[in-house]
Curated annotation (Swiss-Prot):
This protein's name: Pentatricopeptide repeat-containing protein At2g41720
Region (Disordered): 1-28
GO terms assigned for molecular function: structural constituent of ribosome
Superkingdom of origin organism: Eukaryota
Family according to the record: Belongs to the PPR family. P subfamily.
Originating organism: Arabidopsis thaliana (Mouse-ear cress)
GO BP terms: chloroplast mRNA processing; embryo development ending in seed dormancy; RNA splicing
PANTHER family according to UniProt: OS07G0213300 PROTEIN, RESPIRATORY COMPLEX I CHAPERONE (CIA84), PUTATIVE (AFU_ORTHOLOGUE AFUA_2G06020)-RELATED
Record bears the keyword Membrane: no
GO cellular component: chloroplast
Swiss-Prot/TrEMBL PPR repeat ranges: 106-136, 142-176, 177-211, 212-246, 247-281, 282-316, 319-353, 354-388, 389-423, 424-458, 459-493, 494-528, 529-563, 564-598, 599-633, 634-668, 669-699, 704-738, 739-773
Amino acid sequence: MATVTNFKLVTPPESSRADKPGATKASDAFQEKKSVSVNYDRGEHEVSVNIGGLRKADIPRRYRIRVENDRFQKDWSVSEVVDRLMALNRWEEVDGVLNSWVGRFARKNFPVLIRELSRRGCIELCVNVFKWMKIQKNYCARNDIYNMMIRLHARHNWVDQARGLFFEMQKWSCKPDAETYDALINAHGRAGQWRWAMNLMDDMLRAAIAPSRSTYNNLINACGSSGNWREALEVCKKMTDNGVGPDLVTHNIVLSAYKSGRQYSKALSYFELMKGAKVRPDTTTFNIIIYCLSKLGQSSQALDLFNSMREKRAECRPDVVTFTSIMHLYSVKGEIENCRAVFEAMVAEGLKPNIVSYNALMGAYAVHGMSGTALSVLGDIKQNGIIPDVVSYTCLLNSYGRSRQPGKAKEVFLMMRKERRKPNVVTYNALIDAYGSNGFLAEAVEIFRQMEQDGIKPNVVSVCTLLAACSRSKKKVNVDTVLSAAQSRGINLNTAAYNSAIGSYINAAELEKAIALYQSMRKKKVKADSVTFTILISGSCRMSKYPEAISYLKEMEDLSIPLTKEVYSSVLCAYSKQGQVTEAESIFNQMKMAGCEPDVIAYTSMLHAYNASEKWGKACELFLEMEANGIEPDSIACSALMRAFNKGGQPSNVFVLMDLMREKEIPFTGAVFFEIFSACNTLQEWKRAIDLIQMMDPYLPSLSIGLTNQMLHLFGKSGKVEAMMKLFYKIIASGVGINLKTYAILLEHLLAVGNWRKYIEVLEWMSGAGIQPSNQMYRDIISFGERSAGIEFEPLIRQKLESLRNKGEGLIPTFRHEGTLL
């Protein structure tokens, strides 16, 4: 049986502690009495606060006589009345409870009742009780009641109602005091109405009411939370000029203003000033600094600060916000395991994660498409008694979109509606991306239309998502439609949207349209960035417009836009395609001097440039530089280097590079195989070539027909007909398509070695595959039979060709050769 122990602790209010020993009975009636209940078996404890208030014995005698014999009148304490009111259903009236309460005849109970209801946070119940209170005959309007009501409305962002109470209290002859203005400024600040808050401060000064530090703090917060950090600093300066010194709360609000205004560097500078003034920061201060460091990309400094907070727990102990900020930092860096570890450390230290913490964890999983793990986190949220919000469902929806499950994403969307969670614009954008990124453009457009029907206004992110889907479909008509839809809805495109549209046009091979859109972007004074020029330069190279690509580089330099690795690589590609190796070397050196370390793409572009200009030695030197700088080559770089080895007279190095690719598990491509076969041909390494055929099985389906024909020709030209036929059989088995050119290569080399039987067999294969042999193929075999086959085999060749003609039902042409009719 559970063991329960009850304790009663009496904690007098601050005012009564200063009272004399002969305190009035009324002051004792409003003392807070704490009751503690401990269940040792379950390891639970509960603390409740009870306030008695003025009871039946304390009300005037005329009211006491009136309720003396009425069995419906109850002598409840104030806490009991609050509990009964909270137990009412939403549709039940409060009059039934309040009219049965004897304490209603003591007007001093009214402020305490409003205060206790305000603490519970039930605004609708509090409003109904206040309405009932105002119709009581013994009610007297008081400032403290109105101040509590205005503060409660501010907590729930009911700004208009709070202003209504402000004017109502003046009608009831209650003069607003500093606390009233403080509460109303706080209400406008929460709603982002900082100009209203500034006007209230002016009204306060005109009324000769001296603002307190709390008033200034609320006004600074009103400006700062709206992103107006300059106005917040002006108010702070005015505060010190008026002789009101800032406290730690003021400093935290200023830091928060910098954070809201995205002035992260200024926030760090202000923090240094705080340390110079020996202001001791608290957990809130460090939370803001960690956030700013994360936004500036200084993750190591943020982690150092977090670790120092954990080491000095007595001074500033990390709270849920601190851990959540670090989780978000790891999520942005893509370090999911560390994000999960921080979450588990938070739980291990006894902190209870809130919905924001769970959403940060789900967001980390969603970015990587880990839908199963994200779903399990949602289950943990519900299991711990937390109600998932819109962000939770949006993260889960996004995880399904990233894992290529748009159907599951739509199910989550419908589940949100079923559970009465209204999707916002971010939710719709995630659903549009789920369909668009997986090639379902029609469904993405339908979601866009449904979004408008549901009263959610699309934003520029919605347009960007649709444009990205159009880019995958490679249809310029869709791009035009999306752009016109954005224009008709008054959506102004930003840089990211223009980049998506320009990229979509280029993917649809509409370079002129892309250039026209870029010029429109410049006319509308939308600032282009490095991504814009990367798309234009790479697109121009793809369309073989190399001079135009290079002209964009000069335009970037004129606009003082910093060059990125992608821009340098695209320009290197343009120079290499034109054979301008000197200019390519200049750009490559400029890239290194600018502190932009070349990546594998830049090195590959330079390898192609050296190959095009037949500078094989420099290509080999460049590869050594790649290795020295720790750049891992990819398949394209390896094929370019192999070509340099073959052309530069170092075919043996091709095999060394091939072994390196195997060791580092770099995938082989068709170009790589061709260069290896070329090296085998040069060095007469036919055993290695035959072994290579065995290794080609997994790669054959991905090889082009032109490349397979080249490899067949390489074997045939070297007289390795058996290896050629072996490769041909593997090509057929892999399902790769073959054409007339493939058969022509086989026939040419079979005839060159005198294998006329296989020649005729290949002709039969062609007939069976529905490919009609050319006239020249028949002339070649007939000529071979007459000149080289001898008297013994020439009639046999004619007989087989005649049989083949009969099977082909006239497909084989009849022609005369040296007086002989076939």
